[in-house]
């Protein structure tokens, strides 16, 4: 059996028992699963500045949450985010952010979204479920390479000393080596700021590999 096939089979088993099974069980009772997830987030952040202001410690249900927490926009959250950007802890999240994801949104003004370890854990769970289903449906997909487009995760640093940039670049840079071996592109291409050059190198580099996944 090829080394890639051994890795693929091992990965599929790990994904199945780590996240895929739990996700499939949650789909049988999605309302309950979503409420449990919401309440776990509330409990984890109940002693933050935002959590204290909105009485997270008293929230026991979705209705409690709706009554305690107003509908927000980025503008209404900006004062909290600004303090987090300056390195003040426990404002929005109990976890210290690893970085800030940036997006221009619809206004053109840069928006900074705190990326915490617990968020990355949840984000990874979704990727794991997707990857498991892909491996189950296309058993030879990882005999080739994956063309993963990402941008730099370090475009600059906040006043608090944390990097800001693209979360896709952070994930590409921090993947384990046994996952990176399936990537068609080296991380260094992600850091190129000149868009036309970056995409040319992405296409040119991928031509040398058996790309089976975009």
Regions found by a protein language model. Give the residues of each.
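Active-site phosphate/ATP/adenylate-binding loop shared across adenylate-forming ligases
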Residues: 1-33, 38-55, 59-214
């Amino acid at each position: 059996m090829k080394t890639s096939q051994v890795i693929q089979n091992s990965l599929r088993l790990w994904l199945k028992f780590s996240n895929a099974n739990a996700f499939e069980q949650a789909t049988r009772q999605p309302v309950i699963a979503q409420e449990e997830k919401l309440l776990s987030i509330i409990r984890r952040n109940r002693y933050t500045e935002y959590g204290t202001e909105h009485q997270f410690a008293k929230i026991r249900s979705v209705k409690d949450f709706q009554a305690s927490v107003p509908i927000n926009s980025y503008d209404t959250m900006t004062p909290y985010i600004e303090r987090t950007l300056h390195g003040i802890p426990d404002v929005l999240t109990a976890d210290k952010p690893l970085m800030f994801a940036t997006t221009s949104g619809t206004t053109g003004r840069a928006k900074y979204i705190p990326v915490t370890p617990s968020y990355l854990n949840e984000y990874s769970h979704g990727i794991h479920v997707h990857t498991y289903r892909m491996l189950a449906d296309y058993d030879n997909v990882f005999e080739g390479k994956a063309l993963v487009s990402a941008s730099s995760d370090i475009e600059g640093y906040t006043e608090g000393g944390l990097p800001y940039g693209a979360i896709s670049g952070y994930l590409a840079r921090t993947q384990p080596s046994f996952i990176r071996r399936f990537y068609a592109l080296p991380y260094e291409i992600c850091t190129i700021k000149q868009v036309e050059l970056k995409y040319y190198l992405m296409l040119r580099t991928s031509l040398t590999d058996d790309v089976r996944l975009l």
